[in-house]
């Protein structure tokens, strides 16, 4: 931010960039800079070596234009980071300020080597002003972030390390010394200036540098120049230290985040496909190196910001799972400890197992080569605690992919180790024998039509075989859960009233397989999908209405992996469309105060938030938005196959936690609603149980969106 003046005709002075003023042997800086740059490149190569150890296949070389745009939006615009108002914006200020200062330093270097006539006059004043202001915002940002971490101490930052403090101090020192240098230069310039115009240029170009200059006004010019030189070299030394430390500290996230933004999963929310499963020699992930390169990059990208932890329903109800610590950070520590032995085995051609017997490994306090990823590092409790709600992935500013890692480890536990909760084994058996996790005889799958008195409204394809526009995929809950059969009835009546042409497969419909897949039984999942695809294709299905959000996610996002490409809609999307088109006109607005629970699989997994709300408002519902709604919604506890697993209330660290569904129900009951409305059979079951546990059954009823709309139609 140093500029001088040269006289022009007419006596005017024009500001211009003067680099290296008052700095003898300034050229040495370019030689010294080779040291930190070399250290940085060495560190980057060591990171790359570790990522290349990955055995799993992850392909992220498609949609190049979209990836470049993602890199820009989330890296430079900080779109995901600023979701958290205070910390997010302070981080954005720090990033933008550092970025502009880095670019300015690069321009300085270029200006010093080649003539750059544009860095003078009004353009240069504007350039200097932008650098000065954004640099000061960065200084504010780092101070606020330090205050939050060390004085406010939010729970999400409960694993602060000593290195975090040193990094904050280093960044603070770089920024502060930069302004001291600028202030000293301006203070000296003021004393040496002969015109008010020159002083006016200084004030306009560097408002905060001018502020710092006021601190040094009483010093002599010689003292100013001496301190300017000393601080300049100190500033460059700590800046070079910063560069050298990047690959070896959490500063690495500056570059790792850019890679993660570029190579993030651009496909709709879906689990990873296992191709040629019958030929596979192993299933899932047993060792850290079995993951894909993007998974290992994820581990290096985590900055321990705690947003995943803050939003995780399992963590917030006292479970073993902490997506930040017991999952990502434990895996990262394990990878860091194991990588040297894996690299040595790769270099020598030795078997990985042999490295466990080396003297170096044996001398470790905990031999990383003998640690089990599933049992010692992550822990089976952590693996089974996850509800797949996607809150961690939704709020992670680095786009770390937590759920795929959990599911891969479950696959190994289930399909390779044969180690799973007994309730999961029972659900698998039920799905294998009767094609539904309830275990009710498959022959009665269409029985709900007669039970609810809507048989004549349904085109039962195996019997009627009429032409239809949509296939109604009712799912297991409508078929076998007594409470949810009423939802199926309401939906059928609404579709008929609107004149929608639809067919239903009855006993030729099978479980969607979502629970099987998310519990780790990929083979069973693919078997169920194959059976459904055969039925769909036999009847020429093109469009599908799905009742359950879990089935909706499977059919829409995951069935295409096996060739099942259809137009898939959740029923709330169809109802919202019918209401908007005037084909469903509620005649008896309810006028009821209600809270709405966002299903994780309809909301975070698929981005469907507004359509269910529009239906409820059309029905005359007074929808009260609670704090944890939409992207910030709290899981009911049944996702990820946990509908079929027992959950106990946890006593931990002297705190008695409630179950996930009870915790969520308490949130929904805060506004004292007359109704709690869901869009999912699992959610309805869990919230209804929560209302019962809260002894609020008399004052608050639990309904599904379809039921609410039908009530307003009757």
Swiss-Prot record:
The keyword Kinase does not apply. It comes from the Bacteria. Its cofactor is [4Fe-4S] cluster. PANTHER family: IRON-SULFUR-BINDING OXIDOREDUCTASE FADF-RELATED, IRON-SULFUR-BINDING OXIDOREDUCTASE FADF-RELATED-RELATED. It is found in: Cell membrane. [4Fe-4S] cluster 2 binds at residues 312, 386, 389, 392. Pathway: Lipid metabolism; butanoate metabolism. GO terms for biological process: butyrate metabolic process. It comes from Syntrophomonas wolfei subsp. wolfei (strain DSM 2245B / Goettingen). This is EtfAB:quinone oxidoreductase. The chain crosses the membrane at residues 25-45, 87-107, 125-145, 164-184, 207-227, 236-256. Residues 293-324, 375-405 form the 4Fe-4S ferredoxin-type domain. One of its GO terms (cellular component) is plasma membrane. Binds 2 [4Fe-4S] clusters per subunit. Induction: Highly expressed during syntrophic growth with butyrate (at protein level). Seems to be constitutively expressed. Keywords: 4Fe-4S, Cell membrane, Fatty acid metabolism, Iron, Iron-sulfur, Lipid metabolism, Membrane, Metal-binding, Oxidoreductase, Repeat, Transmembrane, Transmembrane helix. SUPFAM superfamilies: alpha-helical ferredoxin, Respiratory nitrate reductase 1 gamma chain. [4Fe-4S] cluster 1 binds at residues 302, 305, 308, 396.
